[in-house]
A protein has these predicted regions:
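The feature captures the beta-strand-to-loop junction immediately N-terminal to the Walker
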Residues: 39-41
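Helix-to-loop junction immediately C-terminal to a conserved catalytic motif
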Residues: 54
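Conserved ABC ATPase "signature" region
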Residues: 70, 118-136
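Conserved ABC ATPase signature
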Residues: 141-145, 149
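Conserved catalytic motifs of ABC-family nucleotide-binding domains
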Residues: 162
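Catalytic Walker B motif of ABC-type/P-loop ATPase nucleotide-binding domains
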Residues: 166-169
Length: 267
């Protein structure tokens, strides 16, 4: 993949389950290094789209290219290589409840490589620290953690193999406003420090205004618009207007404006 080439390129995608068509003629590009937020109403198929991109779905038509490779026709060897370049944080965290945080991260590390256990443990601690968790969280079980810490533990696991792209499904769902804001800043910091590309599904307007370079609106079975927020929030379509120009959208815009005004010059 060239530096200026789309990491994800989707053309003419159709996803359907029986007679129900979820997506029809959907196009989307995701550029290297960007944080793109995907929004849409309930039932618009945001998670279905994510699963199709990472090879967990079976689209009825269209093309999905990930790192320049056609997802549907990858060999098993190529698919394994591509999977190692993708970190995924599912909505429920999906940690193994019988394993400690460090052991959860270690599972991802040892799935593809035979590594000395001592090195695996040190790498797991590094990923746990990267995710903003205190090191004493390493020996705790998921049930002993708060909701925000579970999210961070799952994020540490998704970072285990040094991915190029992070897929996040509703990363701030269930977090209080302070926890959600801290998680947003963590994603921004990781993108900047590790050179990640981030594809996130969210309904959190504050997340969109705080960290997303572009927003893609999924409605009417396709991506209606994918652009910067100032373009998207003025897009002439009823759902988009209700979402961005309603009371919550206005509040998020005001909060983003206050935050921007409080930043030191040059940031």
């Amino acid at each position: 993949v060239n530096a200026d080439e789309s990491l994800i390129r989707i053309r003419g995608l159709r996803n359907q389950f029986g007679e129900q068509v979820v997506h029809e003629n959907l196009d989307l590009d995701v550029q290297r290094g960007e944080i793109i937020g995907v929004v849409g109403g309930s039932g618009s198929g945001k998670s279905v789209l994510l699963r199709a991109i990472i090879g967990l779905g079976h689209p009825a038509a269209g093309s999905i290219r990930l790192f320049g490779e056609e997802v549907a026709s990858m060999s098993d060897t190529k698919r394994a290589m591509i999977e190692r370049r993708c970190g995924v944080l599912f909505q429920n965290g999906a940690l193994f409840s019988s394993l400690t945080v460090a052991e959860n991260v270690a599972v991802a590390l040892t799935e593809h490589h035979a590594i000395d256990p001592a090195i695996v443990h040190r790498l797991a601690l590094l990923k746990i620290a990267l995710a903003g968790l205190p090191l004493d969280a390493a020996d705790k079980f998921p049930a002993q953690l708060s909701g925000g810490m579970v999210k961070r533990a799952a994020l540490a696991r998704s970072l285990a193999l040094d991915p190029d792209i992070l897929f996040l499904d509703e990363p701030t769902a269930g977090l209080d406003p302070i926890g959600a804001a801290a998680f947003d800043q963590l994603i921004l910091t990781l993108r900047d420090s590790l050179g990640l590309t981030v594809f996130l599904i969210t309904h959190d307007l504050d997340t969109l205004y705080t960290i997303c370079d572009r927003v893609a609106v999924l409605a009417s079975k396709r991506i209606l618009v994918a652009d910067s927020l100032d373009v998207v929030e003025n897009f002439d379509e009823p759902w988009v207007q209700d979402y961005f120009q309603g009371p919550r959208g206005r509040a998020a815009q005001r909060a983003a404006a206050r935050s921007s005004a409080s930043q030191p010059q040059g940031h």
